[in-house]
Amino acid sequence: MLKALFLTMLTLALVKSQDTEETITYTQCTDGYEWDPVRQQCKDIDECDIVPDACKGGMKCVNHYGGYLCLPKTAQIIVNNEQPQQETQPAEGTSGATTGVVAASSMATSGVLPGGGFVASAAAVAGPEMQTGRNNFVIRRNPADPQRIPSNPSHRIQCAAGYEQSEHNVCQDIDECTAGTHNCRADQVCINLRGSFACQCPPGYQKRGEQCVDIDECTIPPYCHQRCVNTPGSFYCQCSPGFQLAANNYTCVDINECDASNQCAQQCYNILGSFICQCNQGYELSSDRLNCEDIDECRTSSYLCQYQCVNEPGKFSCMCPQGYQVVRSRTCQDINECETTNECREDEMCWNYHGGFRCYPRNPCQDPYILTPENRCVCPVSNAMCRELPQSIVYKYMSIRSDRSVPSDIFQIQATTIYANTINTFRIKSGNENGEFYLRQTSPVSAMLVLVKSLSGPREHIVDLEMLTVSSIGTFRTSSVLRLTIIVGPFSF
């Protein structure tokens, strides 16, 4: 400002000595300055004092010639003056005030510079630039006084450094960034300021020495939810398999694979970061853990069905042989054909056995036996042939399963008529040639037929069980036969 004031005063002196020149009067100042009627010169406006909340976001306001700066609170400003300190005598007509111009290099320690600037240290102010915290501002300020604008636009004016005269004879800011007159490095960004410029590192970089180096954002948590990938001047977030970035490009959210691209053949269950496949009953996961294969239940167990297991897709079923029906899905139950349908004649009776039925004559008596109302075959005493034959024969039928466990009581014989002073004995008269049976007397009038060898069917056994009755005084002797037909079924059920 002193330099501009000195030139102005010199111009006024020349004007006063030349009577032919038109007297120049000043009516206004450039932007950022106001007229001081006392000192008769333009003075800087301290916007930091008069503008409410001039800087936002925690920035500090630093008054600047013709304007102000909003810088981080940690920023420092070193003023670079291109002229050493000078003192000039006031010209005629001025207030006589002296404005000092102080070179930054003349400051030995930190302190406040004229115009509101700051100096860091003697070593730092030796050069024309400084760094201001992480934002990397390099600021050059030229605190020369702005020139007052003459009311006569035909006269040329002197502008402060960083300004130039416009076609309207006002001092306007020089955009050093556009003009290419800045001294920012190739890896820095030039930012134009009023009357000056600043050099700043691009986003994602920080100043280290004279260079802009990449900021590794991945070392400053928590930038990313899961994975952080640093790139020159930036970074990006990645998610683990099974997750995807949310709209904020930071948070990882689970991918519901069951909704997006269901790869499961049957059932899909989403879990955090993945999914699992399950199969319906009767199927199992294949080796790829996606598809389902039928389980051959019949191969895995031989106890599923009582008779035969039939594998089907996803299930199995049980079958029974002819003469049986499936009950409770797995067991076989004999069908009583005598209660449903049979082919027996009128003179035959139907006898059901395990797995089938047979027709037997309703009158099984053979000559010389005759049928009584009690369904007994009796040999008449009057018939001479009956003297050597059993007095009566009773026909009975029973059915047993194949391979029945032994020993097993299967049939009980008992006298229907009891005579006084008689003794009854029991024996197997015929049909036990292979020793499959044993007759055990259980009382004076009864005996139990015992199966002692397992029988396999289908087959039929006819066993004659005889009861001998003898008088205790030997007056008479008689016998009765129970002809038992044993039908062995084809299966053990």
Curated annotation (Swiss-Prot):
Organism of provenance: Homo sapiens
Reported effect, R140W: In GLC1H; uncertain significance; results in increased protein aggregation and intracellular accumulation
Recorded superkingdom: Eukaryota
Secretion signal span: 1-17
Disorder: Doyne honeycomb retinal dystrophy: An autosomal dominant, progressive, ocular disorder characterized by yellow-white deposits known as drusen that accumulate beneath the retinal pigment epithelium. With age, drusen increase in size and number, and eventually cause visual symptoms, including decreased visual acuity, metamorphopsia, photophobia, and paracentral scotoma.
Disulfide bonds: C177-C190, C184-C199, C201-C212, C218-C228, C224-C237, C239-C252, C258-C268, C264-C277, C279-C292, C298-C309, C305-C318, C320-C332, C338-C350, C344-C359, C365-C377
Localization per Swiss-Prot or TrEMBL: Secreted, Extracellular space, Extracellular matrix
Matching PROSITE patterns: ASX_HYDROXYL, EGF_2, EGF_3, EGF_CA
Upper lineage: Eukaryota, Metazoa, Chordata, Craniata, Vertebrata
Name of protein: EGF-containing fibulin-like extracellular matrix protein 1
Region Mediates interaction with TIMP3, annotated ranges: 259-493
Keywords assigned: Calcium, Disease variant, Disulfide bond, EGF-like domain, Extracellular matrix, Glaucoma, Glycoprotein, Growth factor, Repeat, Secreted, Signal
Phenotype upon changing C42A: Produces extracellular disulfide-linked homodimers similar as Cys55Arg mutation
Glycosylation sites (chain numbering): N249
CDD domains, alphabetized: EGF_CA
Annotated function: Binds EGFR, the EGF receptor, inducing EGFR autophosphorylation and the activation of downstream signaling pathways. May play a role in cell adhesion and migration. May function as a negative regulator of chondrocyte differentiation. In the olfactory epithelium, it may regulate glial cell migration, differentiation and the ability of glial cells to support neuronal neurite outgrowth.
GO BP field: camera-type eye development; embryonic eye morphogenesis; epidermal growth factor receptor signaling pathway; negative regulation of chondrocyte differentiation; peptidyl-tyrosine phosphorylation; post-embryonic eye morphogenesis; regulation of DNA-templated transcription; visual perception
Subunit and partners: Interacts with ECM1. Interacts with TIMP3.
Outcome of mutating C29A: Produces extracellular disulfide-linked homodimers similar as Cys55Arg mutation
